[in-house]
Protein backbone atom coordinates (compact mmCIF):
# COMPACT_ATOMS: atom_id res chain seq x y z
CA UNK A 1 0.00 0.00 0.00
CA UNK A 2 1.22 3.49 -0.78
CA UNK A 3 0.11 5.69 2.13
CA UNK A 4 2.04 8.88 1.48
CA UNK A 5 3.87 10.52 -1.42
CA UNK A 6 6.47 13.27 -1.04
CA UNK A 7 8.14 14.69 -4.12
CA UNK A 8 8.13 17.46 -6.68
CA UNK A 9 4.88 18.55 -8.31
CA UNK A 10 5.52 18.22 -12.06
CA UNK A 11 2.04 18.70 -13.56
CA UNK A 12 -1.39 19.64 -12.31
CA UNK A 13 -4.48 19.44 -14.46
CA UNK A 14 -7.70 19.09 -12.42
CA UNK A 15 -8.15 16.59 -10.88
CA UNK A 16 -4.91 14.90 -11.99
CA UNK A 17 -1.38 15.46 -10.69
CA UNK A 18 2.01 14.13 -11.63
CA UNK A 19 4.43 13.96 -8.70
CA UNK A 20 8.09 13.08 -9.27
CA UNK A 21 9.46 10.99 -6.43
CA UNK A 22 13.16 10.20 -6.98
CA UNK A 23 12.78 9.85 -10.73
CA UNK A 24 9.45 7.99 -10.69
CA UNK A 25 6.37 9.95 -11.75
CA UNK A 26 3.17 9.07 -9.88
CA UNK A 27 -0.18 10.00 -11.42
CA UNK A 28 -2.50 10.97 -8.59
CA UNK A 29 -6.13 12.09 -8.63
CA UNK A 30 -7.12 14.56 -5.92
CA UNK A 31 -10.35 16.26 -4.79
CA UNK A 32 -10.64 19.92 -5.72
CA UNK A 33 -10.25 20.94 -2.07
CA UNK A 34 -6.73 19.46 -2.16
CA UNK A 35 -6.06 20.73 -5.69
CA UNK A 36 -6.70 24.37 -4.74
CA UNK A 37 -4.18 24.13 -1.89
CA UNK A 38 -1.34 22.71 -3.99
CA UNK A 39 1.92 24.60 -4.43
CA UNK A 40 3.08 25.78 -7.87
CA UNK A 41 4.57 23.24 -10.26
CA UNK A 42 8.22 22.56 -9.56
CA UNK A 43 7.66 22.89 -5.80
CA UNK A 44 7.79 20.09 -3.21
CA UNK A 45 4.48 18.50 -2.27
CA UNK A 46 3.40 15.87 0.26
CA UNK A 47 0.10 14.01 -0.02
CA UNK A 48 -1.56 11.24 1.96
CA UNK A 49 -2.69 8.60 -0.50
CA UNK A 50 -5.06 5.71 -1.05
CA UNK A 51 -4.20 3.05 -3.61
CA UNK A 52 -7.16 1.39 -5.33
CA UNK A 53 -6.35 -1.84 -7.17
CA UNK A 54 -8.77 -2.83 -9.90
CA UNK A 55 -8.63 -5.62 -12.41
CA UNK A 56 -7.52 -3.23 -15.15
CA UNK A 57 -5.66 -0.50 -13.23
CA UNK A 58 -3.88 0.66 -10.10
CA UNK A 59 -5.23 4.10 -9.18
CA UNK A 60 -3.68 6.47 -6.67
CA UNK A 61 -5.76 9.12 -4.91
CA UNK A 62 -4.17 11.93 -2.92
CA UNK A 63 -5.40 14.08 -0.03
CA UNK A 64 -4.17 17.14 1.81
CA UNK A 65 -5.36 15.93 5.22
CA UNK A 66 -5.98 12.72 7.13
CA UNK A 67 -9.63 13.73 7.56
CA UNK A 68 -10.14 13.84 3.78
CA UNK A 69 -8.48 10.46 3.31
CA UNK A 70 -10.51 8.90 6.14
CA UNK A 71 -13.71 10.30 4.65
CA UNK A 72 -12.75 8.91 1.24
CA UNK A 73 -12.19 5.49 2.82
CA UNK A 74 -15.61 5.59 4.49
CA UNK A 75 -17.30 6.69 1.27
CA UNK A 76 -15.84 3.91 -0.89
CA UNK A 77 -17.10 1.29 1.58
CA UNK A 78 -20.67 2.22 0.63
CA UNK A 79 -22.30 0.08 -2.06
CA UNK A 80 -22.65 2.07 -5.27
CA UNK A 81 -20.11 4.72 -4.29
CA UNK A 82 -16.88 4.24 -6.18
CA UNK A 83 -13.65 6.17 -5.95
CA UNK A 84 -14.73 8.71 -8.61
CA UNK A 85 -18.00 9.43 -6.80
CA UNK A 86 -16.17 9.74 -3.46
CA UNK A 87 -13.77 12.21 -5.08
CA UNK A 88 -16.76 14.18 -6.43
CA UNK A 89 -18.29 14.35 -2.93
CA UNK A 90 -15.02 15.64 -1.44
CA UNK A 91 -14.68 18.12 -4.30
CA UNK A 92 -18.21 19.38 -3.72
CA UNK A 93 -18.06 19.88 0.05
CA UNK A 94 -15.57 19.89 2.89
CA UNK A 95 -15.35 17.07 5.43
CA UNK A 96 -17.02 19.27 8.05
CA UNK A 97 -19.84 20.22 5.65
CA UNK A 98 -20.40 16.56 4.82
CA UNK A 99 -20.41 15.62 8.52
CA UNK A 100 -22.93 18.36 9.23
CA UNK A 101 -25.18 17.35 6.31
CA UNK A 102 -25.15 13.74 7.55
CA UNK A 103 -25.76 14.70 11.19
CA UNK A 104 -28.63 17.04 10.31
CA UNK A 105 -30.00 14.61 7.68
CA UNK A 106 -29.91 17.25 4.93
CA UNK A 107 -30.17 15.25 1.71
CA UNK A 108 -30.58 18.46 -0.29
CA UNK A 109 -27.01 19.51 0.45
CA UNK A 110 -25.74 16.15 -0.79
CA UNK A 111 -27.78 16.24 -4.00
CA UNK A 112 -25.97 19.44 -5.01
CA UNK A 113 -22.91 17.30 -5.68
CA UNK A 114 -22.89 16.26 -9.37
CA UNK A 115 -23.81 12.58 -9.71
CA UNK A 116 -25.56 12.34 -6.32
CA UNK A 117 -29.29 11.85 -6.65
CA UNK A 118 -31.91 11.60 -3.93
CA UNK A 119 -31.53 7.83 -3.42
CA UNK A 120 -27.74 8.02 -3.27
CA UNK A 121 -27.93 10.92 -0.81
CA UNK A 122 -30.28 8.91 1.41
CA UNK A 123 -27.94 5.91 1.25
CA UNK A 124 -24.99 8.14 2.20
CA UNK A 125 -26.89 9.54 5.18
CA UNK A 126 -27.89 6.06 6.33
CA UNK A 127 -24.45 4.47 5.92
CA UNK A 128 -22.42 7.37 7.34
CA UNK A 129 -24.75 8.19 10.22
CA UNK A 130 -22.71 8.30 13.41
CA UNK A 131 -19.40 7.73 11.61
CA UNK A 132 -18.43 11.19 10.42
CA UNK A 133 -18.97 13.07 13.66
CA UNK A 134 -17.17 10.53 15.83
CA UNK A 135 -14.43 9.35 13.49
CA UNK A 136 -13.80 12.04 10.95
CA UNK A 137 -14.93 15.21 12.64
CA UNK A 138 -12.29 14.72 15.32
CA UNK A 139 -9.58 13.25 13.09
CA UNK A 140 -6.21 15.00 13.03
CA UNK A 141 -6.31 17.77 10.48
CA UNK A 142 -10.08 17.82 10.28
CA UNK A 143 -11.76 21.16 10.17
CA UNK A 144 -13.68 21.48 13.41
CA UNK A 145 -17.44 21.36 13.11
CA UNK A 146 -18.38 24.12 15.54
CA UNK A 147 -21.44 25.37 13.79
CA UNK A 148 -24.21 26.36 16.20
CA UNK A 149 -26.58 23.90 14.49
CA UNK A 150 -24.39 20.99 15.61
CA UNK A 151 -24.31 22.31 19.19
CA UNK A 152 -28.09 22.76 19.13
CA UNK A 153 -28.51 19.22 17.79
CA UNK A 154 -26.31 17.80 20.56
CA UNK A 155 -28.30 19.71 23.19
CA UNK A 156 -31.61 18.36 21.85
CA UNK A 157 -30.23 14.83 21.76
CA UNK A 158 -29.07 15.23 25.37
CA UNK A 159 -32.62 16.29 26.29
CA UNK A 160 -33.90 12.97 24.93
CA UNK A 161 -35.19 13.94 21.50
CA UNK A 162 -34.54 11.59 18.58
CA UNK A 163 -32.13 12.63 15.82
CA UNK A 164 -35.03 12.95 13.39
CA UNK A 165 -37.03 15.21 15.75
CA UNK A 166 -33.96 17.31 16.52
CA UNK A 167 -32.98 17.67 12.85
CA UNK A 168 -36.54 18.72 11.94
CA UNK A 169 -36.60 21.30 14.74
CA UNK A 170 -33.20 22.72 13.75
CA UNK A 171 -34.51 23.42 10.25
CA UNK A 172 -36.86 25.95 11.90
CA UNK A 173 -33.89 27.84 13.39
CA UNK A 174 -32.53 30.64 11.16
CA UNK A 175 -28.89 30.28 10.11
CA UNK A 176 -26.47 32.26 12.25
CA UNK A 177 -28.62 32.04 15.38
CA UNK A 178 -26.62 31.61 18.59
CA UNK A 179 -26.67 28.32 20.46
CA UNK A 180 -28.85 29.37 23.42
CA UNK A 181 -31.38 31.21 21.22
CA UNK A 182 -31.31 28.32 18.76
CA UNK A 183 -32.10 25.80 21.48
CA UNK A 184 -35.06 27.93 22.62
CA UNK A 185 -36.39 28.23 19.05
CA UNK A 186 -35.92 24.49 18.42
CA UNK A 187 -37.74 23.63 21.67
CA UNK A 188 -40.61 25.92 20.64
CA UNK A 189 -40.77 24.15 17.27
CA UNK A 190 -40.82 20.77 19.03
CA UNK A 191 -43.59 21.85 21.40
CA UNK A 192 -45.77 22.84 18.42
CA UNK A 193 -45.17 19.53 16.64
From Swiss-Prot:
Q: Where is this chain's protein located in or outside the cell? A: Cytoplasm
One matching Pfam family, short form? RuvA_N
Ranges for the region named Domain III are: 151-193
* Keywords on record: Cytoplasm, DNA damage, DNA recombination, DNA repair, DNA-binding
Its domain of life?
Answer: Bacteria
Q: What biological process terms from GO does the record include? A: DNA recombination; DNA repair
Q: Where is this region: Domain I?
A: 1-64
Annotated GO molecular function terms are:
ATP binding; four-way junction DNA binding; four-way junction helicase activity
Q: What does this protein do?
A: The RuvA-RuvB-RuvC complex processes Holliday junction (HJ) DNA during genetic recombination and DNA repair, while the RuvA-RuvB complex plays an important role in the rescue of blocked DNA replication forks via replication fork reversal (RFR). RuvA specifically binds to HJ cruciform DNA, conferring on it an open structure. The RuvB hexamer acts as an ATP-dependent pump, pulling dsDNA into and through the RuvAB complex. HJ branch migration allows RuvC to scan DNA until it finds its consensus sequence, where it cleaves and resolves the cruciform DNA.
Q: What is known of its domains?
A: Has three domains with a flexible linker between the domains II and III and assumes an 'L' shape. Domain III is highly mobile and contacts RuvB.
**Which NCBIfam families does this UniProt record tie to the protein?**
ruvA (TIGR00084)
Tell me what this protein is called: Holliday junction branch migration complex subunit RuvA
Per the UniProt record, the lineage of the source organism begins with: Bacteria, Pseudomonadati, Pseudomonadota, Betaproteobacteria, Burkholderiales
Q: Which gene encodes it?
A: ruvA
Amino acid sequence: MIGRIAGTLIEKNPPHLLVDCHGVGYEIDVPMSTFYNLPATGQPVTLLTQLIVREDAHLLYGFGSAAERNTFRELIKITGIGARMALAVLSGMSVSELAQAITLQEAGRLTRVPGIGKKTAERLMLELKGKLGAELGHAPGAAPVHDSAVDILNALLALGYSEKEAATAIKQVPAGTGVSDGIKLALKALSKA
